């Protein structure tokens, strides 16, 4: 029994050495109608689970090993149509890869559409009213995640002026809305929307401080996100802000960190190289 307890203590200690602390972010659910706790559901095209009915926003902290630390940080916003959180291939797997490149990662579970408001066979149909309403809350969670990382920069051994945010699909919408609505204390220093679902984001001007942007999308994406992604790039480029667009053909929606055996598999390495090129990695 004592040996088992010691083994559990070692596992627990090793887990915490990785920095996987979970922080509850400030929130106000006025105007939202949640019933019951968050729910684990089967993920899309995977045996790993997603989360639904998230009513309490959190970040899970993943810190690189000391000798790898570049003092750069990234808030990671998984996708899921504002109804689910694809926390593995668009969250934890991303955090692990970022840590391997010396980047601290904060995986965000932002608030989602209450599960009882989603019809059993209801798809994502225009005008996306539930999802647009939820974005008003989700982007606040992203801003609070940035503010937390910046306020605790010494604790996490990161540079408060090298905090980025990236997101996939609906997480890309959260990324963009947070950027548009940011203030000095919670604005990202660079952003990376990956196949962002811009159909729920109102057309807005890039913020005046001009955060560098790295965009990835495919024309094969069934959600038709290539043109909106190109528009984001054009909006930034017209103002001479640092902007880079990687538009591939092959790659179905939601690839995240999964391998497709197409050139789009290079997107992550390209993103890290870009972060380095704009002076945010060293």
Feature-to-residue mapping (PLM):
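C-terminal catalytic histidine-bearing segment of alpha/beta-hydrolase fold enzymes
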Residues: 239-282
């Amino acid at each position: 029994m004592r040996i088992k307890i010691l083994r559990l203590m070692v596992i627990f200690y090793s887990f915490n050495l990785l920095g996987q602390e979970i922080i509850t972010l400030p929130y106000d659910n006025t105007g939202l109608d949640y019933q019951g706790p968050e729910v684990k559901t089967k993920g899309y095209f995977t045996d790993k689970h997603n989360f639904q009915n998230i009513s309490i926003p959190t970040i899970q902290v993943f810190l690189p090993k000391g000798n790898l630390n570049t003092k750069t940080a990234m808030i990671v916003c998984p996708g899921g149509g504002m109804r689910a959180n694809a926390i593995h291939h668009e969250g934890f797997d991303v955090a692990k890869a970022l840590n391997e490149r010396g980047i601290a990662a904060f995986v965000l579970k932002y608030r989602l559409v209450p599960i009882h408001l989603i019809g059993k066979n209801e798809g994502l149909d225009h005008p996306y009213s539930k999802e647009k309403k939820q974005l008003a809350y989700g982007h606040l969670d992203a801003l609070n995640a940035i503010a937390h990382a910046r306020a605790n920069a010494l604790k996490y051994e990161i540079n408060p002026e090298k905090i980025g945010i990236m997101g996939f699909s609906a997480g890309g919408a959260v990324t963009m809305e947070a950027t548009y609505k940011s203030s000095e204390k919670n604005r990202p220093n660079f952003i990376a929307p990956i196949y962002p679902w811009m159909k729920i984001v109102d057309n807005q001007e890039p913020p005046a401080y001009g955060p560098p942007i790295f965009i990835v999308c495919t024309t094969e994406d069934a959600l038709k996100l290539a043109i909106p992604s190109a528009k984001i790039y054009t909006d930034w480029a017209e103002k001479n802000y640092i902007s880079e667009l990687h538009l591939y053909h092959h790659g179905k929606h939601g690839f995240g960190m999964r391998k497709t055996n197409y050139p789009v598999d290079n997107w992550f390495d390209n993103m890290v190289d870009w972060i380095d090129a704009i002076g945010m990695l060293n």
